[in-house]
Structure formats: structure tokens, C-alpha cells
Amino acid sequence: MPTRLLCLCLLSITAVADAADHLRDLQTAAIKNGQSPVAHWGVDPKNYKEWGSHSNRLIPVYTFGTLGAGEGVDLNSYLGKNSAYRSEAKLKTIYSRVPSNTLNLAAEYCDQTDLAALQRAAFKAGKKHVILMVFDGMDWQTTRLAAIYNERRVCYSEGRGTGTHFQNYTANGTTQFGFMSVAPLNDGTDCDVDTQTVKNPGGKHPGGYNVAKGGAFPWSPPSDDIYYLTGRGPDGKGKGEHPYPDSANTAQAMTSGVKSYNNSINVDYAGQHVPPISHEVQAAGFAVGAVTSVPISHATPACSYAQNVDRDDYQDLTRDLLGLPSSSHSMKPLQGLDVLIGGGFGDTATKTGDAEKKTQGQGKNFVPGNIWLTAADRNTIDVANGGRYVVAERTAGANGRESLLAAADRAVSSSQRLLGFFGIGTAKGHLPFATADGDFQPAVGRANKIESYTSADLTENPTLADMTAAALMVLDKNKKGFWLLVEAGDVDWANHDNNLDTSIGAVNSGDRAFQVITDWVEQHSDWNETVVIVTADHGHFLWIDLPEGLIP
């Protein structure tokens, strides 16, 4: 081959490779250089990773099976003229007060607690299946990030947009779009997990939403007080007017309808238990379940069913989820979920050494070993030992998808419950992170670390889509119906790491799970008897500066 032609071929191959991993290169350069012309996290465009936590941004809501479904089920029951933020009385019901600068007579947004009201209204209206899908940490900007990459074009600058299945799917004309405030009741509440008590009801930093500072829409540009949405003062120091939310309080708002303090798991401001929807519908004969790509009793899946004053009491939260005696239900355990599938496998710690920080929130009854599920509890719930759960867990040499679906089939045929326990112990128990181009080779992030996975990590774990399919198999055996929470938790983990590459991959992984849900509805149900809500619990603080730069 002539030298010139060989060089051209090599250049062409290199260009294809670069295009195929464009986001990895973009992310790697951003971390190396400390800035990127394409995007940044925080208030300073010249500091790519200025902020690595949550924000108080308004969050998009996508509903399916709701348009024209009647008062309380139709999303418009809570938007625009019906917004709680236009009414002092409604704000007092939500916050027990009218927070500073939170009344907004022009508000188009609803409150996060309205999603619980919508779910309850759906069951009251006779719906058989209600599914709440939470893309943890996925604000409007994160969705747009993935949509631009997927579409290979800048296709919108406001509104619902296109580029993912949950944006494009119409559910036979029954889909709706809106957005909500996710402000917490307060931050700074101190708790005692051993006594399950709140030490300072009301905390130290009351919540609310100031539209003049936060914006009227999820896509609003920054205000003059750019620090407001991150809970900081106007100069970036100290406490701002309102705190940003965490994943516990925000999940609880959607599962119970009660706004509470950051770190709460289905308890009110004073630590008193509040019933999540799952308890109510389970008592009425429905099946209930939770699925997540992160550990099984992380904040969002914990809020599907458990009750605890602190989100970090992981082992006790898992006990609630599985119907075992816990610190919050020691005398009368909860019934437990019918299906629980998620991560946490292999994530272990003791009370000594470097691992102590992983156990601090768990109280005196922490059992050294797996942080999320003790060996004794795992054995107790297994049908092999007289328990109620068919257990599928990561097993050396076994295909994770196949073992989980086989266990789901056994659970259906034997009328048993299902526990799926997977993950990577060296990666805090989560499933492998997919990246923008669909491989599993994450780029470096805020922590200046790169996760790497073995072939066993990839084959021995199912995907979130696989987990969702297994959950639907088991829950569908209850002919009365079911309630299900599905969490794409890795979106939040990617955004905490200021990682564009894994953020897109996480959104798309979750989107594939949503595709499983819509396929199931079309094949086994319809949009007259099923309601699905897709949303996030909270956002982060990503800004896309040059959207065209995301296109390979």
C-alpha cells in the first residue's frame, strides 16, 4: 500500500476511534485542564468542577397514562393555576408555614409532594399499576446533555425536548410534561438512630424556593445570586436563603407526600413515621416492589417502603424492606416488599480502621460485614431456610441476567417473593457504570479516579433494564395490581463526580429500563389502567456552555 494511502487510512481509523469516544476525551481533557469550553459544574465557567453536590433547581416531570385521566391523575391538576406555590394555604399545608419569598402567584410548577397525591389518585381512580421511575440527580440540563449526544444535534433549548425514549414516547397520547419544586422542609436536623429520635425538630436551615433567584423554569439562566441554588450565601460563603435537597427527603416527598428534613426516610420533621404509598396499597392487596442500580437501601429505594430517622442506617433500612425486625420496627416488623432488586453485593466494612466512616450512621447494632445486608438477615429471608424470598445474588461464573430472570421465574411459579442482590464491592456496591458510547470504560472524574471493571463484573451483574424486567414478572402475578419504584441511581453518582461521560451513560441505561416498562405496558396492560411517572428527586449544577461541542 502506498505510504500516503496508508497514512490516510490510519488517520481515518483514528478519527473514527476519536469520534466513537468523543465524550471520554472531552471529560478527560476537562479534568486535566480544570476547565472545558463545553460545560462546567458550579458557578465558575473557568472551573470545571467548582461544585460537586446537589442544587435546588426545578425538576422536570414526565407522566404517562395521565392526560385526560381525571382530577388528581391529570398532571394539570397541580400545574399553573392549580400550583400550590400560588396559595398561602397550600404552602402552609406543605411546609407548615409560608417560606420566605416562596409564594409565587405566577408559578407554573407543582410541588414534589404532588406526585404522591397523583399516585394515590391513580389508585383511587381504579388504576391497576403505578410505576414511579426516579433518575436520581437528573435535572433538565443532564437530560439535555444526553439528548444532544443521542441525537447528534442541538434539538431544543427549552421545554420537554427529544432525544431519549422518555422524552419521545407518547403513551397513545396520554403523556404530559411539567416541572416541580424539590425544596426540603429544612436542613440541619440531628438524629439518634439508636433511639430513633430527632434531637432538634425543625433543624437549622428552613427550606423554600425563591423564584427570583432560582428561576421560573428548569432551564432558566443563572440569576444575579448564582450561589442561591447551591444553598450558599450571595458571596458563596455561609448559608443561603434556602438549602438544597438530598435524595432521602426528596424521595420521601414522592413516596409519602410529606415534605421533611434532609436525611429523613418516611418520617416527619419530628421523626414520627408517615406512611408511604406502598404501605397503603399493600394493605389493600396490591403487590409492591423497588429496583435500583445502586445499593438496595440507598436513600431512594429505602423511601419506597422503610421508615427511619436517618438515611445512613443501611442495615436497618434493608430489614424494613425485607420485613425483618429493625431499629424503627423492633417489636412489630413491616410486611416487607414483594420484590427488592439492587446493588450492595460485596460492599463490606468493619467498625475499625478506614472502614469506620462507612458505618457511622448505622448505630450500635451495626453488624460487621456487608454494609447493606447482613449475612444473618440474608439467610433468614431465603426460601431455602424457610424465608419468603427467592434469592438471586451475584455468583462467580454465573450470568447475572440469566440467574436473576431464572429466580424471578421460580418466584412466580412458587408464589414467593424475590430478592436480587448484585453489584461490585470495590465500587461501593453499584452496578457497572455505562458510558456515553455504551461501553463500560468510565473516564476520570472529580475524584481523579477511574473505575475499571473486570469481565466478571460485567457478566455476573444484570443491568437496570434486566432488573426491571424481573420485577415486572413477579409483581404481575398479583392480578389486583402493583406499585413499583425504579431508580436509575447512577445518574446521581456520575453527576457528583462531574463526569459528562458516565452521566450520559447513566441516563441512557435508565432509559433502557424505561423502554422495558413501556414494552411491558403495551404487551401486558394498557394506558387506561397504568400510570407511569418519570422524574428526578433533585438536580445538580451542570451548565452546558457549548452544546455543539457535545456532538461527536
What are these language model-derived features?
Residues 248-265, 301, 492-494:
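Short, conserved helix/loop micro-motifs enriched in His/Cys and acidic residues
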Residues 107-121:
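A short, compositionally biased domain-edge/stem linker segment
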Residues 2-8:
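Sec-dependent signal peptide recognition
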Residues 10-18:
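Hydrophobic h-region of N-terminal signal peptides that target proteins for export
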Residues 267-273:
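Glycine-rich anion/phosphate-binding loops
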Residues 20-75, 82-85, 96-107, 123-124, ...:
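A post-motif C-terminal structural segment
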